[in-house]
Amino acid sequence: MHEGVQVSSKLEELQALLAPVVVALGYECWGIEFSAQGRHSMLRVYIDKEGGVLVDDCAIVSRQISGVLDVEDPISVEYTLEVSSPGMERPLFTIDQFAKFAGEQVKIKLRSPFEGRRNFQGLLRGVEEQDVVVQVEDHEFLLPIDMIDKANIIPSFD
C-alpha cells in the first residue's frame, strides 16, 4: 500500500473518532489534517461554530480530544495536537465545503499532476458530482476531489 493510501485511511479513522467528540461539544468539525513526519508529526483539528471560534473554544476541544486520543491511541508515532479555527485562509476538505464557497478565489494543490499541472489558483466555480470546478484565467478545470491534497480560500480584502 503506498503512503497516500495509508495517510488517507488514517485520516478517515481519525475523522470517525474525533468528529463526534467535536460535534458533542457544540462545534462543527471542519476538517482534520495529519502530517506524519517522524518526531515532528502534527495532528491539526479545525473547528468552527456560528459567530466564530475563540481561543477558549480551542482549549475546550483540545482537552476533550486529548482524552479520547490517550484512551484510543490511534497514532503510533509521537505527535503534536493543534486545535484551531479555519481562519481567513480557510482550508476546504469536503465537496459540500467547496460548493458552499463557490465564487471565492482558491488555491488548490493536487496529489499528482492533472492536465500537466499540480497547482491551481483561480475562481472556485462550484462542484459537479465529485469534481471541483476551478476557473484559471479563461480555462475551466474539473478537478476530482480525491486528487486534491490541499485547498484553501484566498481571502480578499475589498
From Swiss-Prot:
Family annotation (InterPro entries): Ribosome_maturation_RimP, RimP_C, RimP_C_sf, RimP_N, RimP_N_sf
Q: Which GO terms describe its biological process?
A: ribosomal small subunit assembly; translation
Q: Does the keyword Membrane apply?
A: no
| Lineage top rank: taxon | Bacteria
Which keywords fit this entry according to its UniProt record? Cytoplasm, Ribosome biogenesis
Q: What is its main location?
A: cytoplasm
**GO cellular-component terms in the record?**
cytosol
Task: Please indicate if the UniProt record lists Hydrolase as a keyword.
Answer: no
Where in or outside the cell is it found? Cytoplasm
Query: Which Pfam family would be a valid example here?
Result: DUF150_C
Report the sequence similarity comment from the record. Belongs to the RimP family.
Q: What does this protein do?
A: Required for maturation of 30S ribosomal subunits.
* Name this protein carries in UniProt: Ribosome maturation factor RimP
What organism, scientifically named, is this protein from? Pseudomonas fluorescens (strain SBW25)
